[in-house]
């Protein structure tokens, strides 16, 4: 009897509380639903933005891996060139040569691009970077992703090019056409694309938003050698390493090997590339902002 008597007030209180809540809900149902809706949106947004860092990191990893972003890069001192094949020879000569998965020589030179020959209403004359590289390789390093059009073939006589896609978008340029580079040389580009190291890049004099201020043109190595007057010469090499390789040790060996060639060079890692540094730093910075 004591138990029943003690439970009845609790039961009556619960019943009264539910009736009062129901009456209050009916009187303020619009506000209640609005508050619930706002809370649901806030919870969903926080959960979504709170996890952006991980999927952005995974996306970056996949993008760099798909285009075989270099692990190490050899860059000769400005204005220095060396005979094609010598950098590859230096790479093959190091003690840990078996740690190298693939390597490619390049010729990277400054130039200018004039879009006036495209016949558009507006044309631009901007600083440019010509990247002479190998197309159609079975073991590419820093391959070109083609968004539209086609890339040059592996044929020695092919002198077509790929125009960097962000520059083309900034100036609303067509997928293919003919542009002029320094010396009035015509270059026919057949596609728009980008290499992984140019996912982000600085423009002239270190400008950050450089998409429209620097034209990057990817051409076969022989084409850039011809255009720049550096026949048979290179000044750059990019390298990928096998899984588990000691990157720092390989870099030190490469530095010593290139020094023996009698030229000044810088050995940099993929982490030194603007694209890698900025894109990954942005992840952490943005995540801290969303978390705040």
Residue ranges and their predicted role:
Residues 1-292:
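Membrane transport/envelope proteins' first extracytoplasmic loop
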């Amino acid at each position: 009897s004591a138990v029943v008597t003690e439970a009845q007030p609790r039961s009556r209180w619960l019943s009264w509380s539910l009736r009062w809540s129901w009456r209050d809900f009916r009187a303020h149902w619009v506000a209640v639903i609005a508050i619930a809706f706002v809370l649901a949106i806030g919870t969903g947004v926080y959960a979504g933005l709170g996890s952006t860092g991980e999927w952005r990191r995974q996306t970056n990893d996949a993008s760099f891996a798909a285009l075989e972003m270099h692990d190490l890069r050899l860059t000769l001192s400005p204005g220095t060139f060396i005979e094609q094949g010598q950098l590859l020879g230096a790479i093959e000569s190091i003690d840990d040569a078996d740690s190298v998965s693939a390597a490619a020589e390049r010729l990277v030179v400054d130039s200018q691009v004039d879009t006036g020959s495209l016949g558009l209403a507006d044309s631009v004359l901007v600083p440019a970077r010509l990247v002479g590289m190998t197309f159609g390789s079975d073991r590419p390093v820093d391959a070109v992703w083609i968004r539209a059009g086609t890339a040059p073939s592996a044929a020695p006589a092919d002198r077509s090019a790929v125009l960097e896609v962000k520059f083309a978008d900034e100036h609303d340029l067509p997928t293919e056409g003919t542009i002029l580079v320094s010396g009035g040389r015509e270059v026919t580009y057949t596609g728009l694309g980008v290499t992984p190291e140019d996912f982000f890049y600085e423009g002239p004099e270190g400008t950050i938003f450089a998409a429209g201020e620097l034209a990057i043109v990817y051409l076969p190595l022989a084409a850039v050698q011809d255009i720049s007057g550096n026949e048979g010469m290179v000044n750059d090499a990019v390298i990928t390493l096998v899984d588990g390789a000691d990157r720092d040790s390989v870099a030190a060996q490469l530095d010593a090997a290139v020094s023996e060639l009698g030229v000044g060079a810088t050995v940099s890692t993929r982490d030194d590339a603007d694209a890698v540094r900025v894109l990954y730093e942005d992840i952490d910075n943005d995540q801290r902002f969303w978390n705040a």
